[in-house]
């Protein structure tokens, strides 16, 4: 059996804002990793509870930083700027890693020639008391072949940020989280990463994602507006080749994503997708007509072609 020789340093970054209720469980799950070449960075984003007291109780088992409040993206960026690892792994202060999370993903990298791939997986949802609710397994809905298409999982909202193992080099090549985005800083950056990087889906469930009351305090309207801007922005940036890569054709991609937007209440993005679909259809029809005219000119000449066009217009006039 081939021995695992690739054992890079992995930086687990835990951004925290008023997370005293759950952060000890998160830190303990990071410390319990079976893969030992890790550093654990806790970034206190201006908390006003007992976050600092809890973090300091771990001593030199973790790297602890305090900063003024700037949002999750800001705290993650602070950690990234101070990390030493070749790979980045995000752990929310209210979530948990399975003990083999990092080891399992490094084992995957050992089997791959491309060490700059982004690895992701499914996850388990838990409640406030850590009771299991249900499992989210993308491979129950889609084939691995599709889940390994770089932008496919992102544009189907299948990626949980804490499942990812990301090569640190991508932050140097592409940049950090947009700190002006309160709700969508993660998907905004994943989109940039996945346009240039390969992705690998693993069927294992390796994290527990907690659902609790404190997560519902954000203003729903503000969230919706930011997500609308995110999805609409993706549509405007995607190339024809990327749409074809994801769904086989631009028309199929736009049709499917329009359904996704409508189902999730992103009405502005839904309308944009429909408009782009109509534009593609009209554009394709115009291209067809132009080709037919050129063919007719070459075969029959200008006079006959004009007659054919006039006849077609009269026939199709309402």
From Swiss-Prot:
GO biological-process terms attached to the record: biosynthetic process
Keyword annotations of the record: Glycosyltransferase, Transferase
Gene Ontology MF terms: hexosyltransferase activity
Keyword Glycosyltransferase among record annotations: yes
Similarity-based family: Belongs to the glycosyltransferase 2 family.
PANTHER family to which the protein is assigned, alphabetical: GLYCOSYLTRANSFERASE, UDP-GLCNAC:BETAGAL BETA-1,3-N-ACETYLGLUCOSAMINYLTRANSFERASE-LIKE PROTEIN 1
Organism: Rickettsia typhi (strain ATCC VR-144 / Wilmington)
InterPro entries the record matches: Glyco_trans_2-like, Nucleotide-diphossugar_trans
The protein, known as: Uncharacterized glycosyltransferase RT0329
Major enzyme class: transferase
Enzyme Commission code(s) on record: 2.4.-.-
Tree of life domain: Bacteria
């Amino acid at each position: 059996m081939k021995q695992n020789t690739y054992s890079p340093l992995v930086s687990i970054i835990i951004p925290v804002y008023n997370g005293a209720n759950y952060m000890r469980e998160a830190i303990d799950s990071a410390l319990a990793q079976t893969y030992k070449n890790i550093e654990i960075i806790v970034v206190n984003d201006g908390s006003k509870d007992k976050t600092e007291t809890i973090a300091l109780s771990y001593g030199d088992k973790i790297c602890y930083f305090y900063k003024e409040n700037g949002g999750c993206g800001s705290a993650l960026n602070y950690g990234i700027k101070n990390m030493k690892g070749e790979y980045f792994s995000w752990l929310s202060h209210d979530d948990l890693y399975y003990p083999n999370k990092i080891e399992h993903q490094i084992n995957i990298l050992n089997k791959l020639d491309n060490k700059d791939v982004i690895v992701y997986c499914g996850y388990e949802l838990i409640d406030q008391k850590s009771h299991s609710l249900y499992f989210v397994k993308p491979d129950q809905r889609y084939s691995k072949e599709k889940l390994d298409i770089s932008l496919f999982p992102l544009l189907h909202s299948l990626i949980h940020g804490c499942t990812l193992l990301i090569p640190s080099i991508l932050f140097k090549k592409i940049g950090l989280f947009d700190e002006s985005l309160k709700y969508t800083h993660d998907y905004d950056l994943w989109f940039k990463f996945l346009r240039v990087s390969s992705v690998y889906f693993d069927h294992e469930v390796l994290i527990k994602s907690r659902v609790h009351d404190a997560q519902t305090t954000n203003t729903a309207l503000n969230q919706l507006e930011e997500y609308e801007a995110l999805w609409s922005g993706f549509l405007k940036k995607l190339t024809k080749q990327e749409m074809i890569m994801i769904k086989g054709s631009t028309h199929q991609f736009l049709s499917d994503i329009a359904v996704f937007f409508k189902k999730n209440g992103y009405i502005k993005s839904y309308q944009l997708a429909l408009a782009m679909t109509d534009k593609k259809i009209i554009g394709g029809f115009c291209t067809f007509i132009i080709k037919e005219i050129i063919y007719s000119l070459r075969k029959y000449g200008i006079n006959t072609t004009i007659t054919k066009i006039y006849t077609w217009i009269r026939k199709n006039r309402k």
